[in-house]
């Protein structure tokens, strides 16, 4: 009977050692993982900081073509009007002066482009973007050296009668 008690005590001590070793192993694994993330996460953050910051593009001079354009569209089945306010972004003061000097020619070209479109062609975002590109290209062909960077529609209304 005394031998049985000793065997049970030794078996119980073995379980305690096993639990202690497992806890120690988990603790070491946690410490190792923490050290890894602490050391290597800092290096990744430093790499991101070293990446060159891209400066936002510089905005040019804005020029509003006033009054707004009120144009009949090319819809065959109904009378459709478009009211569009346009602002131009120009590269520099010289281009601005040329735009101001040639504004009647520019306005005529824009009216010609808009009046050739149907309401279905310019009703969608893609259609409006295409219209902007056409206007931009036409204006830059009118100017001696181009220089209009972008065309902005600040008002865009289509009305069907």
Swiss-Prot record:
Residues spanning the signal sequence: none
Membrane protein topology class: Single-pass membrane protein
GO cellular component, one term: plasma membrane
Tagged with keyword Transmembrane: yes
Transmembrane feature ranges: 18-38
InterPro entries the UniProt entry points to: FliL
Any one biological process term the GO annotation gives: chemotaxis
Protein name: Flagellar protein FliL
Organism whose genome encodes this protein: Aquifex aeolicus (strain VF5)
